[in-house]
Amino acid sequence: MIVERVDFIGVPVRDLAEADAYFRDTLALFERDPRSSDRWVEYDAANVTLALVPEAYKPGGHEPLPFASVVVRVDDLDGERSRLSERGVEFAGDGFDSGVCNGAPFVALEGNGMMLHRRYAPFADGQVPEAPRGHVDFVAVPVQDRDRAEGFYGGALGLERNPRSTDTWVEYETSNLTLALVDPTTAGQEFKPLPGASIAFRVADVEAAKAELETAGVEFPAGIIDSGVCHIAPFSDPDGNGLMLHHRYAPVQER
């Protein structure tokens, strides 16, 4: 199976209009997609889309993204933190300095976990990280058994393991988004998986990709759903993180 890219990160919301205003006016880190409607709103980061997913599309109650799930690059972390704090955004403690980067986790609207991030040190190979403000540096994928998770993301999904991964920090790459396998308990957080359909993997043929994953033991309780513009097939990784196969077959309207 070939994952072409991540089409979007699903951000669960209860009130779509309120969430739209929050992402536009409070966070002000991403560009609102002009194709958004009163039923589906998207914000474009530098490398990936964040889709605000109302409860109508995710029955079963509101489940927010867990702690520090969506990690967003900024140039001036202290300045951005001050700006957001003045707008009522709640940060978790004083943030951290890992020795190579600074981070400031915060709780976005509806309890969704996000984090401001700035890497200041070059990578081990000497390369300097370069990306604009608003780039999603990675999505933190909570795991309880890293070896099992590596077998799934590198084996079943066929993603490339980042060669800069270490014994304590492992990343897998799509063409546009990094997935970091993290054990939240090492940061004093409770393990909570990503809610349903949080990461939408673009594939050329949903039915074929689904069949291939089923041979690896992956289950698709909802089968394949036709939304009228795309085919989707929700599934979970071994830790219960909500993922999705996605293929849009309808033409994309011009902006």
Regions found by a protein language model. Give the residues of each.
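Short hydrophobic/aromatic beta-strand element in the GNAT-like acyltransferase core
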Residues: 42, 103-105, 171, 200, ...
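Vicinal oxygen chelate
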Residues: 1-2, 81-132, 138-141, 210, ...
